[in-house]
Swiss-Prot record:
Positions annotated as active site in the UniProt record: 128
The protein's name in its UniProt record: Casein kinase 1-like protein 9
Upper lineage: Eukaryota, Viridiplantae, Streptophyta, Embryophyta, Tracheophyta
Region span, Disordered: 300-471
PTMs per UniProt: Autophosphorylated on serine, threonine and tyrosine residues.
UniProt KW keywords: ATP-binding, Cytoplasm, Kinase, Nucleotide-binding, Nucleus, Serine/threonine-protein kinase, Transferase
Native source species: Arabidopsis thaliana
GO molecular function per UniProt: ATP binding; protein serine kinase activity; protein serine/threonine kinase activity; protein serine/threonine/tyrosine kinase activity
Gene Ontology annotations for the cellular component aspect, listed alphabetically: cytoplasm; nucleus
GO biological process: signal transduction
Family membership noted in the UniProt record: Belongs to the protein kinase superfamily. CK1 Ser/Thr protein kinase family. Casein kinase I subfamily.
Subunit and interaction comment: Monomer.
Every Protein kinase domain range: 9-278
Gene name in the database record: CKL9
């Protein structure tokens, strides 16, 4: 496609596609800067790119938020141009043989909580927290985690009046089944607590390699989702976090103790993991597991190589600083062509649900993928036409408790479904919850496989060549 976007962004090769449209590498012909260009047909039944671009504009300036370069209509396409980013955490998780060390998880947790907190301070929920939606930067930003994919984002309060959205039930499950909170499975309107609970599942996924509700078998997709929900509700926090530091139990207990409109104490959650990090004797040197795999000599000076990977070192006397300088020199020698081939932009790892059964069958075949991808207004957005029947559940209240440590509610609500201990309380008289759940791709399906079809070399390997570290 020989096209110049907005008069200055020239399209390069295609690096991804899906129900949302197509993704291309691009270059600013005026500055030579590489960018990511996302195209969506103007004829699509449920356009979402305009909505997503508005969220990008509202979130601009935040650490770990890609810059929106341009949005508009070009020919038959809605077009959004943003920063080009590196591999997703799911890609790096796979690169590290599907298990991350405690040190790496704790370094990630600090940034991940910050990203979610920033989005909440701007008045929006993410509602699809998963490894695919967090990407590492490139070059000097290679240690920075970026949050992407705001297609399911929803405004949860008015920034002027601070009025919180009302508590509701019987909501369709929105997000990705594997990481969705218990209350989301039960059909409760999502709020800040649900983004944080989902983040907790992501951390346990990294530490343990899988979650207890993965790999469940069922005759239909609806039955599969019901089994995921039942398993998640029935799994005590202590079992979920077995053989892991107690701080993770505390994290989940806190998230599940929050009432619907409570403001979480993000500082408390970050402090939990920071204190654990210090107690373990780790150094916050940004030497992640994938860094040690790529540059084993760095692990010898990170002060924690024995806890991360037991790699042999090529030069035990090499300092981390010297390694970083060497790594930057290597990255500096990359040609523009290799950088284009190696970098994978944020949105190529999205697996959004579509509005029709035809689109879903083409882009989603797995049960753990995103379940809804229709852009809402400030209220609820249109849902999928997918119908798998209804699953009735009763709302489950927890016992009464004092105010959360996070501070006052935006408007006190007594509605909570999960007890602070992670168990399930007595069944209430609330209406049953009906969940119509879309089909989706496995979150672990990496978009790198799509990009690899367009190039002879492994794009993840080239993307990792670009990762440079900085203390």
């Amino acid at each position: 496609m020989d096209l110049v976007i907005g008069g200055k962004f020239k399209l390069g090769r295609k690096i991804g596609s899906g129900s949302f449209g197509e993704l291309y590498l691009g270059i600013n012909v005026q500055t030579g800067e590489e960018v990511a260009v996302k195209l969506e047909s103007v004829k699509t039944k449920h356009p979402q790119l305009h909505y997503e671009s508005k969220l990008y504009m509202l979130l601009q300036g935040g650490t770990g938020v890609p810059n929106l370069k341009w949005y508009g209509v070009e020919g038959d396409y809605n077009v959004m141009v943003i920063d080009l980013l590196g591999p997703s955490l799911e890609d790096l998780f796979n690169y590290c043989n599907r298990k991350l060390s405690l040190k790496t998880v704790l370094m990630l947790a600090d940034q991940l909580i910050n990203r979610v907190e920033f989005m909440h301070t701007r008045g929006f929920l993410h509602r699809d927290i998963k490894p695919d939606n967090f990407l590492m930067g490139l070059g000097r930003k290679a240690n920075q985690v970026y949050i992407i994919d705001f297609g399911l984002g929803k405004k949860y309060r008015d920034l002027q009046t601070h009025r919180h959205i009302p508590y509701r039930e019987n909501k369709n499950l929105t997000g990705t089944a594997r990481y969705a909170s218990v209350n989301t499975h039960l059909g409760v309107e999502q709020s800040r607590r649900d983004d944080l609970e989902a983040l907790g599942y992501v951390l346990m996924y990294f530490l343990k390699g899988s979650l207890p509700w993965q790999g469940l078998k069922a005759g239909t997709k609806k039955q599969k989702y019901d089994r995921i929900s039942e398993k998640k509700v029935a799994t005590p926090i202590e079992v979920l976090c077995k053989n892991q530091p107690s701080e993770f139990v505390s994290y989940f207990r806190y998230c599940r103790s929050l009432r619907f409109d409570d403001k979480p104490d993000y500082s408390y959650l970050k402090r939990l993991f920071r204190d654990l990090f210090i107690r373990e004797g780790y150094q916050f040197d940004y030497v992640f597991d994938w860094t040690v795999l790529k540059y084993p000599q760095i692990g010898s000076s990170s002060g924690s190589s024995s806890r991360t990977r037991n790699h042999t070192t090529a030069n035990p006397g090499l300092t981390a600083g010297a390694s970083l300088e060497k790594q930057e020199r290597i990255a500096g020698k990359e040609t523009r062509e290799n950088r284009f081939s190696g970098a994978v932009e944020a949105f190529s790892r999205r697996h959004p649900a579509t509005s029709t059964t035809r689109d879903r069958s083409a882009s989603r075949n797995s049960v753990d993928g995103p379940l809804s991808k229709h852009p809402p207004g400030d209220s609820e957005r249109p849902r999928s036409s997918s119908r798998y029947g209804s699953s009735s559940r009763r709302a489950i209240p927890s016992s009464s408790r004092p105010s959360s440590a996070g501070g006052p509610s935006d408007s006190r609500s007594s509605s909570r479904l999960v007890t602070s201990t992670g168990g399930v309380g007595t069944v209430s008289n609330r209406a049953s919850t009906s969940q119509r759940i879309q089909a989706g791709n496995e979150s672990r399906t990496s978009s790198f496989s799509r990009a690899a079809r367009n190039t002879r070399e492994d794009p993840l390997r080239r993307s990792l060549e670009l990762l440079t570290l900085r203390k």
